[in-house]
Amino acid sequence: MNDKQTILTLLLPKAVLKAMTPEAERAVPDGMIESGLISIRQFPFRVGRESRGAIVDGEFQRTERPRFGNRKPDNDLYLIDAGPLLHISREHFQIESTAEGYLLVDRGSACGTTVCGIRVGGSDTGGSAPLRDGDTIGIGTESTPYRFTFISGLISDSR
């Protein structure tokens, strides 16, 4: 592989998540989203919650997830769940690349995940479902505002 190909392989996304709601777009930290798109450059790609929320003196306040030393992050993407009722678990789901295609794995989240409206996991049980180009991912309950579309096949991911 030449240097240019190596650079492109490292920098270009293998897939993306497209934010489908304003709430989903606002949940993504600055620097992780561009034009409503989140780049996925490696698999598994792990997603979870960045912060907790609480009502203090009648106002919603967010407390950040503590970081301990040089510990490796639990997620590749930390979403900010701004609602008073949390939809997103700290370690919610991951996207895997397999020989057969892509797989969404719920990592034992409390509220579960949906793939095109089909419930995966929830009640801390975990679960998995095939994930195809164009599928919609809902993070949390049926009424979650955190919805994304999975777009695959951008470059080869050495499956």
Which functions belong to the PLM regions below?
Residues 1-86, 135-136, 145-159:
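Intrinsically disordered, low-complexity acidic Ser/Thr-rich regulatory segments
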Residues 37, 92-94:
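Short, surface-exposed charged micro-motifs
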Residues 30-31, 86-88, 122, 130:
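Short solvent-exposed loop/turn micro-motifs enriched in small/polar/acidic residues
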Residues 47, 94-103, 108-110, 114-159:
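C-terminal boundary/linker segments immediately following FHA domains
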Residues 82-83, 90, 125-126:
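A structural connector/turn signal
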Residues 33, 74, 91, 101-102:
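Hydrophobic alpha-helical segments, principally membrane-spanning helices and signal/leader peptides
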